[in-house]
Swiss-Prot record:
Keyword flag Kinase: no
Signal sequence, renumbered to the chain: none
Gene name of this polypeptide: H2B.3
Cysteines engaged in disulfide bonds, as pairs: none
Positions of region (Disordered): 1-61
Positions where N6-acetyllysine occurs in the chain: K7, K37
Domain of life (superkingdom): Eukaryota
Protein name, UniProt field: Histone H2B.3
Amino acid sequence: MAPKAEKKPAAKKPAEEEPAAEKAEKAPAGKKPKAEKRLPAGKAEKGSGEGRKAGRKKAKKSVETYKIYIFKVLKQVHPDIGISSKAMSIMNSFINDIFEKLAGESAKLARYNKKPTITSREIQTSVRLVLPGELAKHAVSEGTKAVTKFTSA
């Protein structure tokens, strides 16, 4: 008897090795092939040198804070006392919050009086409305003093 030829099972290619063209043919007729990912306009990949000159770093956005002014006032009042970064952050948030409230109240007052401009009068009235009692009186007097000094200089 002659030896039988050995039968080997047909080797299947792994799915990863199939070319993209064959995959596109197997896609359903109604669907489009997936588009490649793109970056938003104006933003280039890190590897490409588009947009910026090579070697230059991107400039940081400056965030305006009142930290230096808070520190100056602290040193005027208590020269021997320091302030922690967390306390400084709280004070900065406090000032931003107060200014936001005063600006909102001043805008309302200007709208009520049908005026297009916020003047020192609206600011003074909003200080009286937002701040309580004695604090408002001191704030108004200090504000008036600052405006007088500014206009005379």
